[in-house]
Amino acid sequence: MYQWIQRDSDVHQRWIWCRRLLIVSLVSALMSVLQVIVFRFVDPPLSMTMVGRYLEAWSDRQWNFRLHYVWCDLEQIAPSVPISLVAAEDQRFPFHHGFDFDAIKNALGRHSRGGHLRGASTISQQVAKNLFLWSGRSFVRKGLEGWYTFWIELFWPKRRILEIYANIAEFGDGVYGVQAAARRYLGKGAADLDESDAAQLAAVLPSPRHYNIQHPGPYIRWRSSWIQRQAKQLGGSAYLDMH
């Protein structure tokens, strides 16, 4: 009799914990969706990438570290910038729904042939990662990135995705957004950037802390020219206006 009672008690405790876990999971899911909805209308004061950079600096005792981040509406950014970002990072941005399966397939194909496995993240995925998640590589983070990307594409227009991307992308150590980068490295505002300037900013995005916008090396000069050619082939800023 005692064993039956104990067994029923164990089953009851398990059910309580399962129910609590389910409630926590549902609340977390709803909160994440609410985050996405809020930032559809509210400009983010910081991103998780910026928070992570602050923590990294403090852990290294860099007490004087400062972020350079100035929000700039897309209307106040030169038309050359969005198309340069798309040409550099995600040329199918107007057409996909957050995931570029062709790019993923091509990346895996190159890797299977012995090439380096390059990322195939879309601009939408990069926004999800930079705005809401931590740095690093893990299946958990990648899964959450996919979750946030789905809701971003559902609730945000492409224009809003590109606007937030242009503002939270890192262009140098502690320098976030086109406006801050333009002022710090090029001595002008985001509204005054020409095609060459925009391509030069976009060229460092694979490794913004490794490359220098003010003193570009051969690779950045080559990549900047390539981005300008790609932007023209896509049709310039009209490529984004049409979609």
Swiss-Prot record:
Report what the protein is called: Biosynthetic peptidoglycan transglycosylase
Q: What is its EC number?
A: 2.4.99.28
- Which residue ranges traverse the bilayer? 21-43
Topology class, membrane: Single-pass membrane protein
In terms of HAMAP family, this protein maps to: PGT_MtgA
Q: Which family does it belong to?
A: Belongs to the glycosyltransferase 51 family.
Keyword field: Cell inner membrane, Cell membrane, Cell shape, Cell wall biogenesis/degradation, Glycosyltransferase, Membrane, Peptidoglycan synthesis, Transferase, Transmembrane, Transmembrane helix
Role played: Peptidoglycan polymerase that catalyzes glycan chain elongation from lipid-linked precursors.
Give the catalysed reaction(s), semicolon-separated.
Answer: [GlcNAc-(1->4)-Mur2Ac(oyl-L-Ala-gamma-D-Glu-L-Lys-D-Ala-D-Ala)](n)-di-trans,octa-cis-undecaprenyl diphosphate + beta-D-GlcNAc-(1->4)-Mur2Ac(oyl-L-Ala-gamma-D-Glu-L-Lys-D-Ala-D-Ala)-di-trans,octa-cis-undecaprenyl diphosphate = [GlcNAc-(1->4)-Mur2Ac(oyl-L-Ala-gamma-D-Glu-L-Lys-D-Ala-D-Ala)](n+1)-di-trans,octa-cis-undecaprenyl diphosphate + di-trans,octa-cis-undecaprenyl diphosphate + H(+)
What PANTHER family does UniProt report for this protein, alphabetically?
BIOSYNTHETIC PEPTIDOGLYCAN TRANSGLYCOSYLASE, MONOFUNCTIONAL BIOSYNTHETIC PEPTIDOGLYCAN TRANSGLYCOSYLASE
Supply one GO CC term from the record. Answer: plasma membrane
Q: Which domain of life is it from?
A: Bacteria
Q: Which organism is it from?
A: Xylella fastidiosa (strain M12)
- Annotated compartments: Cell inner membrane
Query: What GO biological process terms does the UniProt entry carry, in alphabetical order?
Result: cell wall organization; peptidoglycan biosynthetic process; regulation of cell shape
GO MF entry, a single one: pentosyltransferase activity
Q: One Pfam family of this protein, by short name? A: Transgly
- Pathway(s) of this molecule: Cell wall biogenesis; peptidoglycan biosynthesis
